[in-house]
Structures are given as C-alpha cells and as structure tokens.
C-alpha cells in the first residue's frame, strides 16, 4: 500500500516543504527505506529485523513534527501524532498509551477503505446511474427508453429533476463504541450490532432530491455494498503493523530528574507504559489484535530542562537513533518564507487573490520579516518558524481586514511597511511578549 522511495528521493521530497535539518531528513529517509528492505526478506529473518526508532532533539518550531507528518503523507502510511503529556499511567484518570495504537488502527482502516473505494469507483458510479434511471423511468422500462434517458442524464439535461431514492440509514448504526467513565478518549473495543450481523437488517430511508444531488449518496451506498469489510479490516491491521508511524511529541516533559515528587512518579509510569509498545507487544482493538513490533516510533522533545539521559534507560535503548535539529538561523527563516511549495508568502498571496487583491512582497520586506522574527526569538522566547506566522499576521492585519472592500487593487509590501506595522511593538519588549 505504501509508496516506496529511495532515501535520496525521500530527502528530495522533504526538501520541497521543509528547510534545512538534513540530518533528521536522512535519518527518517533511511528508517523508511529499511521498512521496504525488511519486506523483501524471507521469514524468519523478516520477523527478526526491528525498526530503528528515532529520538529527535531540538527546540520548538524547527521542523520535528513537520518532517514526521510529511514523511507519513509521502509514504501513504498510517500516521498518528500524540503528545506524551496527554497520557497517564494505567490506573490513573486519563488516557492510557494503548489508545495510541487503537487510534493508529482507526486511521489505517480509513486509509484502506478510501483506497478500496477508489478501486471500485467506476463500478459504484455505474450502479448508481442504474438506480437513478430506475427512479426516473421505472425498473420495467424498455432498454430503448433507458438508453434515451441515460443519454439525457449524462448530458446534464435531467440534473434539476426531482426523484425519490432509497439509501441506507447510517444513523441507525452510529454507536459503535462506548466511552469508559472517568477516562475521556478511552474506548472499549466493542463492535456494533450491524458489524456482528453483517448486512442483515440494515435500515433504509427514502429521500427526495434532485438528480444532481442523488449521485453522491447513491455512489456511497453502492460502494458500501461492493466493499468487503472483513478484507478491509485484515489489510488495515497488516498495514498498521508493518507501515504504521507513531510520532510522540513532548517526550522531554515526561523525562524525570532525581526527586521523589508524585508527579515524577506518574511521569515515570507513563514511560514504563510506553516501553512494551515501543519494544513490541499485542494490543486488543475492536478490529482484532495488533502487534506493535514493527511500528516505527519517532519521539521528539526540546529537552530544555531535562536531558535525553533523564529518560528511563530502557526507553533510551529503544530509541537508538538520535538526531539533533539545529535552531533556525536568519537565513533559514528567510528561506522558509519563500522556498517551500506552500511557503507563507505564497499562502498569503493566494488568500488575497481570492478577494481579487494583488499582493506583492519585496525582497527587502522578506529580509525585514526574517530580521524581526530572529530578534523576537532571541529576546522573548525561541519558537522557531512559528514566529514568522505571528509577524506575518501582524504585518498583513490591515490588508486582510479591508481586502473585501479593495477588490481590483494592488498592495506592495516593502521593508518600510513591515517596520511601520511592527516596529514599535517589536521595540517594546513588555508589549511584544503579549502580542508577538
């Protein structure tokens, strides 16, 4: 199911969206390729090769999450991002770490279902067309009549005609899981009745709609009939086990220093609960058992207060690849504004174009934006590239507000405009703490 890239191709693709951090890109590219290499091995060697989990160390806003998220999108793998601080030790109120794997399986099921729906899209569309014709001319109409109406249907002549269609009533099957009291987000893996009984007794409802609007619900209905749910679940479990990526952010927040505070004990408990997941265990989900042995875990943290060595030694050993991400320089911030395919500058120009406002941002304005972001990061708190969004919003605040009234006009943003919009705020440290 996953798309296969060489490490060089993976890095090249990541370069299109993320500036710098080549060491981190190389590490994740190799980890991704190693999964494909493992799949080429014969049993029993294939089972013995474990993923080399990664620990990314670096300040906020330098691309840790971006690299992992883009990697998953690139490969088509099921991906789940969680924050370590959201979980509690088993036995305490809160989410337990096994929910990470259940969420991953849910995402895998959605991915596989979408892939299967694409494969049967044409067949589902043909079946939906037949049902629209049934509603228009009746099931007993002659082939010549049906062909005549089919031609009109395809040419759009009947789009506004009202028809009655019968589709599945999805509301009758909505409750598939139960929340466990006192544990928000944790769900018992219980299949709903329709899953157990298959397609028996599915309710339908009659809807009155136009021909144009009838196609989507009918295609959805026909797709569900054509899909083999059992096959989807089996493939989703296999994909989650072999291709799943779990990104655990803020892992430094559960690293403990010496000290016997109860909070430290709880944080250590979360680490101990993570251990079997990262090492390899079997988790029960509502779709079946899933083994975590070959899921790739990428953990990340700033480690401002704590150090990687403050993590439990057992957990450190299960994150063998360490990558340090560098703080962003002025040049990095300048490149982030302009080079990525969906850079901030391109985003704002495209947004203003929807209001028929032409936005031109000069090179000296880009330099000024980067300078201000670097200065604020140094003086207040270093939040990396995220500072650029704050600065850009402030600079374009007036234009964004008045854009609907200025259709057909052009605005030129230069360094003077940037300094005028933000200069006084940036100079006043106390004020900029709250606004920038």
UniProtKB/Swiss-Prot annotation:
It holds the Pfam family AAA. ATP binds at residues 19, 61-65, 249, 314, 386. SMART domains: AAA (SM00382), ClpB_D2-small (SM01086). GO terms for molecular function: ATP binding; ATP hydrolysis activity; peptidase activity; proteasome-activating activity. NCBIfam families: hslU, PRK05201.1. PANTHER family: ATP-DEPENDENT CLP PROTEASE ATP-BINDING SUBUNIT CLPX-LIKE, MITOCHONDRIAL-RELATED, ATP-DEPENDENT PROTEASE ATPASE SUBUNIT HSLU. This is ATP-dependent protease ATPase subunit HslU. It comes from Bartonella tribocorum (strain CIP 105476 / IBS 506). The lineage of its organism: Bacteria, Pseudomonadati, Pseudomonadota, Alphaproteobacteria, Hyphomicrobiales.
